[in-house]
Amino acid sequence: MLTPVYEEQFHDHSYGFRPNRCAQQAIITALDRMNDGYDWIVDIDLEKFFDTVNHDKLMTLMGKTIKDGEVISIIRKFPASGIKEDDEYRESVIGTRQGGNLSPLLANIMRNELDKEMEQRGLNFVRYADDCINMVGSEMSAKRVMRNITRFIEEKLGLKVNTTKSKVDK
């Protein structure tokens, strides 16, 4: 029910966990951009994405598309997996179940905000799940993209960039 609604909104350069899309298509798109002269790579990896998704931010994003309050209420229960510590259960306001049926869609809804931001900035990018690469023409541009997109991810989406795995390279 939700997938067709959101598929219309998802960016063409988003390939992870989507119908009729695969990693090979993402690689082909990236190679095409590199062959066009965009040979500096900004490789951005999100740190522990499923553990750090803010439920309120996600529900706000979903509320822009889904207007039925009952549907939102049902969906809100899904990511609130809670935490069990010392034999005591408490609700969690961040994170979503990794491996759950709805998790990939919820993840793409959140990460679609990143896709829209990169498109608005005119970037050549490919995203597969929580890995994103931007292809640019110079080292200076690559460093600027890394800095600005990292700031967007952390300040606007409330997510964390994995600085160990993320890099600028040619």
Regions found by a protein language model. Give the residues of each.
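Accessory, often N-terminal, substrate/partner-engagement and coupling regions
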Residues: M1-P4, F17
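Conserved polymerase palm-domain catalytic core
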Residues: Q9-R21, Q25-K170
